Swiss-Prot record:
Spans through the membrane: none
Record-level GO BP terms: protein folding; protein-containing complex assembly; urea metabolic process
Name of the protein this chain belongs to: Urease accessory protein UreE
General function of this protein: Involved in urease metallocenter assembly. Binds nickel. Probably functions as a nickel donor during metallocenter assembly.
Source organism phylogeny: Bacteria, Bacillati, Bacillota, Bacilli, Lactobacillales
InterPro entries (alphabetical): UreE, UreE_C_dom, UreE_N, UreE_N_sf
Keyword Cytoplasm attributed: yes
Family: Belongs to the UreE family.
Organism listed in the record: Streptococcus vestibularis
Gene, per the UniProt record: ureE
Amino acid sequence: MIFTKVDALVKDIDVDKYHIETVILSSDDLNKKIIRVKSDHGNEFGIRLDKGQKLQNGSAFFIDDHHVLVIGVESQDLIVISPKDMDEMGITAHILGNTHKPIEVKDAKIYLEVDPVVEQVLTQKEIAYTIEEVVLDKPLRHVNLTAHEH
């Protein structure tokens, strides 16, 4: 079976009405438009998403009237920065922009993959950070300035 669109998010499904099969992906796999997966039940599925469709933690695909395939994301260690004020946020954004690393900003925190060079720079600039095990809902991404409009 090949899925071409995300039918729902698991949070919007009455899970008591369905038998749930899950597949755990890396956050990088969420960027893929075409992927073959194997569920926790050993069933193989293809995902070839239509334009505009994106995978995320909790994406759900209806297999039939009684079965749903749900995408989960494995946890990973990430650098987590919680800037103490707007000045530190600006400095941190400038530093990270120069590294060209994909990031996620959520709830006033900056998330990015563990990188010894980034850690060294943050330490040198006295920017506090932690390494935390995190499950991302969406993949880390580069800032897309081409989408900027006025």
